[in-house]
Amino acid sequence: MARVKTLTILVSANGYGHIRRQILIARELLRRFSDFRITFALTDKQYQRFKLDIEALGEMADVVAGVTEDSVRWRHNPENYTDANLNGWETEWKSHAKLANSDFVISDNLVGVLEKRPDAVLSGSFLWHEVIAAYSDRNEACKRFVDREISLLRQNVPKMICNQSLASRAVIGLTSPVEVSWMIDDIIQQQTLALRRSILVHGGGTRTLDCKVLEIARKLRQANFKVFTDLEDDQDCFDYRDETWRTIGVVVCRPGAGTATECVKWKIPMVVLRDAENSEAEFIAERLTLLGLAHGLAGDLDSDQLVDLAKDAMAIEKMQKYIAPFENCRRNGVVETTDFLENYWKLSELAK
């Protein structure tokens, strides 16, 4: 009987797209291999948000919560970055022998893993040094972080699973990219266009655009639209349930990879809420605009102009035009990723 193989999945603290895609990959791995134990290393908040999804994976999946609390995330104030909140997670992770010494490691956007585990497979469509570099001349901790991440990547040239539609220049240039299509789970039934009458205004989970989100939501509500936001204290905080996604006709958002993936899944056009200081957000917005999936990138649109764009996308007679580009999106990324891991780690041979 084959020995149970262990996999640790480390997940960046920034937003929910990271953990959502890793749950899909874990589910497909466990579907193929019964002798596989997967442990997620998450923040407490990620665990609470996705507890039921992880439990649904069965007894071969578990969680160590709190490990990645002190991992890099987007902050508008460069003075708020320290060595501790950029790299502190590494000490916590290394203290858990079960995590650090597992047979395999996937790290979603946390490059520091390569120091202990140069064999780790990275996952994500951008690298954190691309974003933090904007603050390198104002904060020594940021400069050290950027220099170290680039050095680790050049030394190890790791495999990195990335969305072929969104992969950044640094991912392509500094890693050995494994380009896959959109990571969409089971094919779901789409709602009739005429019934998709709600709007989601979403700041991307980083909390840096909350005031803008609230302003746009207020104006859309004044125009009698049903509006959800990602603000926890809002009267209509979005619950991310399938039945709620089915009601959404347009998403006004700072388009991170996670939000973009959900919009591709549900075929929901996006109106871009810009975050000009964040190079990742701007790059993704450009890519989505080129693909015809997002609108409003040109110029620096004010909230009234963004509201008008959202209204236009919600017009019944125009909805099909906005949705048409989504038909060109390939959605097999979960299977493609698992195929790669199965071959790269020789899992079929190990199972014999």
List the predicted regions and their residue ranges.
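C-terminal amphipathic helix plus adjacent low-complexity
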Residues: 309-352
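Conserved nucleotide-sugar donor-binding subdomain of glycosyltransferases
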Residues: 71-113
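Donor nucleotide-activated moiety binding/catalytic core segment of transferases
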Residues: 228-265
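A nucleotide-sugar donor-handling region in carbohydrate enzymes
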Residues: 124, 129-197, 203-206
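Short internal beta-strands
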Residues: 38-45, 161-163, 226-230
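Catalytic binding pocket for nucleotide-activated donors in carbohydrate/polymer assembly enzymes
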Residues: 259-308
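Conserved nucleotide-sugar phosphate-binding/catalytic loop shared by glycosyltransferases and other
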Residues: 4, 11-13, 36-85
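Conserved catalytic-core segment of nucleotide-activated headgroup transferases in glycan assembly
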Residues: 21, 25-28, 184-233
